[in-house]
Amino acid sequence: MRLEKGMKIKDTLKIMCPGTQLREGLENILRAKTGGLIVIGDNKEVMDTVDGGFNLNSDYSPSYVYELAKMDGAIVISEDLKKIVCANAQLIPDPSIVTHETGTRHRTAHRIAKQTNNIVIAISQRRNIITVYKGDIKYVLRDSSVILARANQAIQTLEKYVSVLERVINNLNLLEFQDLTTLFDVVTAIQRTEMVMRIVEEINMYILELGNEGRLISMQLNELVKHIERDGILLIRDYCKDEDGHNEVYEQIQKLSATELLDLDAIARVLGHAGESLVDTLISAKGYRILGKVPRIPSTVIENLIKEFKELNSVIEADIDELDIVEGIGEARAKAIKDGLKRIREQILLNKKI
């Protein structure tokens, strides 16, 4: 599984993506060029900073928020976004809280967000932008057309990266069946998989920002990546020295910086092959990835096969009688494994995806 990065801002963006009632209210204020300051949540920490204004406790409505924003003060909305608690309020945060924002509205918003850890939204009257604050995080909401253009560009980039990854993986598949895989081939495949997954993460952020306008981008993304992450994890499991630590290895690869990811030796170190020559070191696959592509073979049977034979090449060379003695494999399943591996080999030789 991918590491959850930026969860705070992701959860925040979900409640104000296009198509939501909150976003509609924000867009109305933006179009009217009145500016505004909105706090989400009416807990004690927030209400202690509120001075003046008037209590409403009225049902939330985008048009109500738009009308109330015409006044100078802040609007406080309940945590569940169902009630407008108060309007035209003056917010008095702790002045000792450091902020580098300019403009009274944005300085107040940043300080309130830091002080209460609530979501605070500042809508600029002159610059016509929506800025979201949550704790120390600041995020500028962009127009849907801008995000859509960037998402489409990212999808085009992803298509090229997936195409390169497929060529690398097909080459690796061929070498695995010939038992000629080098450390260079393995780390290149892992590097390319991680590059693809990082672009996927970026596109997922765009989809989150687009809300219901991001459905087509989401469909394109799902069609492009399919089982890439799963195969990447199995690839790591095939080649990392500590078989039980493959999930930790995957996490370490995700934590590599963009510069470190370009260094194949750095990836080899994470796999447990530090100091080994990338080109000269032959390395055999355990077989999790290829055996996982054989139809109707449970993961427990794959585990038993690898426990018995240690390497993929030993499984390929084993006859039906040798396969039959493995726990969970009868004669019928042994034949299915032999036939399945034969078909996969033929597909690889024909340069087809498996």
Swiss-Prot record:
One biological process GO term for this chain? Answer: DNA repair
- According to the entry, every stretch annotated as the DAC domain falls at 6-144
Question: Mind listing the UniProt keywords for this protein, alphabetically?
Answer: ATP-binding, DNA damage, DNA repair, DNA-binding, Magnesium, Nucleotide-binding, Nucleotidyltransferase, Transferase
Q: Name one GO molecular function term.
A: DNA binding
User: In the Enzyme Commission scheme, what number(s) does this protein have?
Assistant: 2.7.7.85
Swiss-Prot/TrEMBL cofactor(s): Mg(2+)
PANTHER family linked to this entry: DIADENYLATE CYCLASE, DNA INTEGRITY SCANNING PROTEIN DISA
| Quaternary structure note | Homooctamer.
Q: What does this protein do?
A: Participates in a DNA-damage check-point that is active prior to asymmetric division when DNA is damaged. DisA forms globular foci that rapidly scan along the chromosomes during sporulation, searching for lesions. When a lesion is present, DisA pauses at the lesion site. This triggers a cellular response that culminates in a temporary block in sporulation initiation. Also has diadenylate cyclase activity, catalyzing the condensation of 2 ATP molecules into cyclic di-AMP (c-di-AMP). c-di-AMP acts as a signaling molecule that couples DNA integrity with progression of sporulation. The rise in c-di-AMP level generated by DisA while scanning the chromosome, operates as a positive signal that advances sporulation; upon encountering a lesion, the DisA focus arrests at the damaged site and halts c-di-AMP synthesis.
- Can you say what this protein is called? DNA integrity scanning protein DisA
Protein's gene: disA
